[in-house]
């Protein structure tokens, strides 16, 4: 690192005065490219770390058989990487990393070379293996779905610095910055100004938000996830329920996506265009006037200077 220390438990792996050689760090890594030796069989690839670590041959064979069973490749030991599918090659890479019983498992974009359906399958497979072996795992990905499915805790890193760290649902439901809100899932970001202790305004649009103690006149940014917004037929003037924002708008576009419909709705009270995710079949078409309802609790306030 440029500064500070790298620790695993009480062990210092790297500091200004200490550097532990890689072979003594008790770590294993799974690469984006799998890094399998094409001239070696599956069993020989998996055995490499055991051989390097001095594990006796008789003991190696038992460990190889056990780990291939764990990754659902029992009977594939004599095959070569070129005879395997992408998903099977990934499982070999996972087996090679796990068989040495590392203290830390590192994965660098391990699923990026797989097609969409296989990538989804391997997410759950990696999670299953993590739960079985209980190895602390550091997983690097730009795929938010992978991060949400696989992790217990996730860190969003921006320009080399941690922007926010927490459980996946915390990052999604309560982002602390504009960057995190946009990076984890889809969202509507509204630049506004605080007009009371618990609400913001943009033009004639006024929103109750999930915050208190705002200073009137202070700039603010509100994040609203598309799935928390409800659309309905526009009725007469109604008094919103406590803690609810009741707005009106017009549908600009309704896009059928199979299991959902993606709407774009322009709000009458301002120049804001909201993206809304709703169930199928579509409940409104382009040009339809609609009511727009969103709970104040779902309007997350973010720093305006992010």
Q: Model segments located where?
A:
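C-terminal boundary and immediately downstream tail of ABC-type ATPase nucleotide-binding domains
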Residues: 173-196, 223, 293-295
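A generic structural motif
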Residues: 188, 255-258
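OB-fold (S1/OB) nucleic-acid-binding surfaces
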Residues: 201-205, 266-271
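ABC ATPase nucleotide-binding domains
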Residues: 22, 26-28, 32-179
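Short aromatic-glycine-enriched beta-strand elements
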Residues: 260-263
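Glycine/charge-rich catalytic "coupling/switch" loops of P-loop NTPases
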Residues: 204-255, 281-306
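Conserved ABC transporter NBD signature motif
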Residues: 4-15
């Amino acid at each position: 690192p440029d500064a500070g220390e790298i620790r695993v438990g009480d062990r210092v792996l790297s500091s200004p005065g200490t550097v532990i050689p890689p072979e003594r760090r008790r770590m294993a890594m799974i690469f984006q490219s799998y890094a399998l030796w094409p001239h070696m069989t599956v069993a020989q690839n998996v055995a490499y770390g055991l051989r390097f670590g001095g594990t006796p041959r008789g003991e190696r064979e038992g460990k190889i058989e056990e780990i291939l069973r764990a990754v659902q490749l029992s009977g594939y030991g004599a095959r070569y990487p070129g005879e395997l599918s992408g998903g099977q090659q990934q499982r070999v890479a996972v087996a090679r990393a796990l068989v040495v019983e590392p203290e830390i498992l590192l994965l660098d974009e391990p699923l990026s070379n797989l097609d969409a359906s296989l990538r989804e399958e391997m997410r759950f497979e990696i999670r299953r293996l993590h739960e079985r072996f209980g190895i602390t795992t550091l997983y690097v990905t730009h795929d938010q779905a992978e991060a949400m499915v696989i992790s217990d805790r996730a860190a969003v890193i921006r320009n080399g610095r941690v922007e926010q760290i927490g459980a996946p649902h915390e990052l999604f439901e309560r982002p602390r910055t504009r960057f995190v809100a946009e990076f984890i899932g889809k969202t509507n970001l509204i630049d506004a100004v605080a007009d009371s202790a618990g609400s913001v305004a943009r033009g004639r649009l006024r929103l109750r938000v999930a915050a208190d103690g705002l200073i009137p006149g202070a700039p603010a940014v509100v994040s609203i996830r598309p799935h928390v917004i409800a659309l309905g037929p526009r009725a007469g003037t109604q008094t919103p329920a406590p803690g609810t924002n009741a707005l009106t708008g017009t549908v600009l576009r309704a896009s059928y996506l199979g299991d959902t419909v993606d709407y774009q709705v322009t709000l009458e009270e301002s120049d804001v265009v909201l993206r809304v995710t709703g169930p199928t079949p579509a409940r409104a078409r382009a040009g339809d006037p609609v009511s727009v309802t969103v709970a104040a609790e779902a309007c997350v306030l973010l720093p305006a200077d992010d």
